[in-house]
Amino acid sequence: MAITKGEDVYASLLLNDAYLPGALVLAHSLRDSGTHKKLAILITPENISNEVVEQLQTVYDYVIPVETIQNDRPANLFLMNRPDLHSAFTKINLWKQTQFRKIVYIDADVVAYRAPDELFDLPHAFSAAPDIGWPDLFNTGVMVLSPNMGDYYAMLAMAERGISFDGADQGLLNMHFRNTYNRLSFTYNVTPSAHYQYIPAYKHFQSSINLLHFIGSEKPWVQGRTQTTGSSTYDEMIGRWWAVYDRHYRGNSNKTTDVVQKFVKGEQQQQQQQQQRNVSFQLPSSQSHKTQSHQTQSQNTHSTYTSHGASWDASRHSPPAGSKPEAANFPQTHYTMSSNTQQFVPPARYPSPPKDMWYKVPEAAPTQKPAPIFPWEKQAPEPTRVFPEPPPEQGKLSAASTATPSAVASATASPTLEPKSEAVTPTTPASANPWTSFTTRGNAWDDVPEINRYVDALQKHRRSGSKGSAAATSRPTSPGRAQSRSRKSSRVTDFPTEDDRPSLPVTPAPIQGPRSSRGENERQFPAAAGVPAQSEWNPAVQLEKLAIHQQETLQKLGERPAFGGLAIGTAGKEIPARALPFGSEDARSPTYVTQYPSVLSPKPLRANTTGTNSVRRILTIDEEGGDVPLTTTEKKTPSPLPTQPSVTTAPPSYQGPGVAFEKGEDFPTHETPALPTEEERDVLET
C-alpha cells in the first residue's frame, strides 16, 4: 500500500518471530476498538521468516524493513536480567520515518482496551507515560513522537557509543529527552505486575484504562493459557489478552492459525486434539470395523506427536517453572568389550539375497577384478594376513593321540640323535587359552640379511671384545652348546639364554660407551702446535705464572705520577696541564672521577711489657691531666702529603658505660654475690 505523505499511523516493532502473537493481538485490539488510523510495523528482515511476514501483511497496512542496531556493551542488560533486549536500539528508527506526520508507537506486548486516537492531536514533539519501576522516568512502551532526522542522528550517535544507563532503548531515550518530553497519564501505559498491584487505584481508574502493557520476559503467549486461572487483578488483565486472541485465532483450522499457534504455548496441542476428535466423530459406522486397527495406530502416533508439541522449545522460551533436570533423560546404554578370544570362522554358506528387490542380483561372483582407480591400487603389496586353519576332526585327533607314546619311545631309544626342527605332536593337552601360544621372540625383519649385516657392523667392536675375554676363560663345552653359541645373535628381539647372560649385580653399573680394542681401528691424533703434552703439564706452575703475569700487568696499568699529567699505557706519556677556557672552570667530564688524597690507616703496635709503649704513655698522660698527642715521635710514618701541624684532641667528657652497651640501656652499679658452690658448702658445713 502506498504511503500518504503526512498521515498519522499506529506503529509497532518486531525483532524476532517469537513476538508474532503479540503483534497480531495488538493490531486486532486496535481494529476492534474502531480506529480508522493506519497500522504500520517495523521489522528486521534478517531475523523474521517469510511466513511471519505474510501474517503481518494480513493485519498491518505497512510492513517496513529497518536495519538492526545492537548494543555492543550489554553489561547493564544483565543487571536487569534482560539480555534479550540487545537489539532494542532499533527502536530509534521510528524517528527516521519522516513520511509520517505523527506516530503513536506501541510495543508488541500491549493490548488495547480502546484506541487512543486523541494522542495524534498533541502539539508536543515527544510524549510518554511514567514508568512503574521509577516514575521519574518514562516508559518507552507507548510513545507519541514526530519523526525528524535531527533526533535520529543524535540518538544514533549515542547508540553507537553505547550511551544508555540500562543498556536498552529506555535508558537512551530518557537521557536524550530528559527535560523536553510531555508526561502522559499512566492510563495510556498501564504496566501490571504479578508481584505488586495497587488494587484500590486499579479499581478506581479501571474504566479509564486505554492500553495494557505486559512488561518483563513472561508474556501471556509464553506462559500459556493454563498458567493463570485465578481471579486476581493480574489474571483479569491477562484474560483481556486471551479474549482478543480467542476471538481471531482459536477454533479456526487454516494456515494462518497454524502459523500463529506455533508460537503460543499449548495451543498447537489443543488444535491437534480437536482435529483428532472431529475425525473420530465424522467417521461412518459402516467403516468403523475396517479402520479400527488404523485408528489405534493413528492414536498412538498422535499421542507421541502431541507430547513433542507440548515440550519445551529452548530456542524460543525459558525453561518451565516445574520442569525436571534434563540429565535424567540421558541414555543409559553401556557397551563392553567382547571377552570372546576365539577366532572368527566364516560360515560354510551365506544366506541368499531376497527375491523381491528392485535391482537384479548377479547370479555368479565376478571373476575379474575391477579396474584400479587410485595410484596405490596399481602397486598394492600382496596381502600377508593368515587365516586360521579349520579345526581337526575328532577322529584324526584321537588317532594322533594314540600315536604319541610310540613317538616318545622312539625318541627316547635314540638319545644320540639331534632333535629336529619339526615339532612332534605334543603329549600334553592344549591349553584352553589360545593366547598362551603367542610368542614375541621373533619379528618379520629378523630374517632379512641386510638388517643382520647392519646390526653386525654396529656391534662389531663389542663382539670382538667379548670374544677376547671369552677366549681367556674358555672351558670345554658340549658340541650342541658350542653350535648354539656360534650362531650370530644379530636379532634385536632375541633374549640371551641362561648360559649366555652373566650374573647381574644387585646395584646396576653405569652404562659405558663403546670402547675399541688396542689392535683394531686404533688411531692417534697428532699433537697441536704450542700445546704441551699431558705429562709435561703442571697446573700449580701454570697458576703461579698466571698470578705473576697479572701482578705485572696491573703495575704497568697503575703507574701514575703524583703531580702533573696522567700516565697513558706503558710508554708513560704525560698530558700537559693547561688552564681551561674562560667560563669552563667548573665543567667536569662525564668520565671524571674525583681524586681524594691518600688516607693512612693506623698501624698495629707491637706489644711491649716494659711500660714504655705509646699506649701506656697516653694513659699516663691522661691520668696526669695533660693533652694526649695524636702522633708521637717514637714511630715515624711516611706520608706523601705535605707536613701538617699536630692536632690535639680533648679528653672525652662522657663518663657513662662503654661501647658494649646500647643507647637507652642501663648498666649495673652494684653486684650481687653468687651462691656458694657444692664444694664451698661442704667446707662451710664442716
Curated annotation (Swiss-Prot):
Q: Which cofactor does it need?
A: Mn(2+)
Per UniProt, subcellular location reads as: Cytoplasm; Vacuole
Q: State the disulfide connectivity.
A: none
Q: For this UniProt entry, what is the primary localization, expressed as one broad class?
A: cytoplasm
Annotated region Not required for catalytic activity: the residues are: 307-686
By its UniProt entry, which Pfam families does this protein fall under?
A: Glyco_transf_8
Residues recorded as binding UDP-alpha-D-glucose, renumbered to this chain, are: 13, 16, 19, 82, 91, 107-109, 139-140, 166, 169-170, 216, 219
Quick check: keyword Glycoprotein in the entry? yes
Keywords, in A-Z order? Cytoplasm, Glycogen biosynthesis, Glycoprotein, Manganese, Metal-binding, Transferase, Vacuole
Q: Which residues bind UDP?
A: 13, 16, 19, 82, 107-109, 213, 216, 219
Site, as annotated: Important for catalytic activity: 91
Asked whether the keyword Lyase is assigned, the reply is: no
Question: Would you tell me the Gene Ontology cellular component terms?
Answer: cytoplasm; vacuole
User: Which parts of the sequence bind Mn(2+)?
Assistant: 107, 109, 213
Q: Which reaction does it catalyse?
A: L-tyrosyl-[glycogenin] + UDP-alpha-D-glucose = alpha-D-glucosyl-L-tyrosyl-[glycogenin] + UDP + H(+); [1,4-alpha-D-glucosyl](n)-L-tyrosyl-[glycogenin] + UDP-alpha-D-glucose = [1,4-alpha-D-glucosyl](n+1)-L-tyrosyl-[glycogenin] + UDP + H(+)
Residues listed as glycosylation sites in the UniProt record:
196, 198
Q: Could you give a GO molecular-function term held by this entry? A: glycosyltransferase activity
Could you tell me which PANTHER family the record lists for this protein? Answer: GLYCOGENIN SUBFAMILY MEMBER (PTHR11183)
* Family as reported in the entry's similarity comment: Belongs to the glycosyltransferase 8 family. Glycogenin subfamily.
- Provide the protein name: Glycogenin
What's the source species for this entry? Neurospora crassa (strain ATCC 24698 / 74-OR23-1A / CBS 708.71 / DSM 1257 / FGSC 987)
Read off the lineage from the record.
Eukaryota, Fungi, Dikarya, Ascomycota, Pezizomycotina
Q: Which gene encodes it?
A: gnn
